[in-house]
Amino acid sequence: MTFVDSCVLIDIFNDDAQWKSWSIDQVSRALPRGLCINAVVYAEVSSSFATQHDVTTAIKHGRLDIKDIPMEAAYLAAEAFKRYRLNKGQFKTALPDFFIGAHAQVLSCPLLTRDPQRFATYFPDVQLITPTAAG
């Protein structure tokens, strides 16, 4: 199973000129092992669609399994946010990336993303599939 970050799906859904091809290729490579997202990713990609039905249809078409966020992941997200604040992070509430990274860690699955910095810093045990790592 591969956890897919919202930026990768937004590339595809919004026909991003720079990243759509890479994102489609990586999703296609990961598809045989299964793909998943959570409600946070669902919320972030929703702005690309006119209706909830459209979002859900696109998610189903992409064969993405929507996983509930377990309490263990919520706790890990909070712990990551505490470290972020200690590192002088400016945001006052937990960032979506913390819920995404923590969920991938709890599931012990790789995370497909174009934005590896925060994930690598706060979830170093999560294998990242990125433009640099993918080659």
Which role does the model predict for each range below?
Residues 12-16, 44, 87-91:
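Short, flexible loop segments at the rims of nucleotide/cofactor-binding pockets, characterized by
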Residues 50-72:
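Active-site-proximal, substrate-binding regions of enzyme catalytic domains
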Residues 8, 41, 73, 99-100, ...:
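Alpha-helix capping/helix-boundary segments
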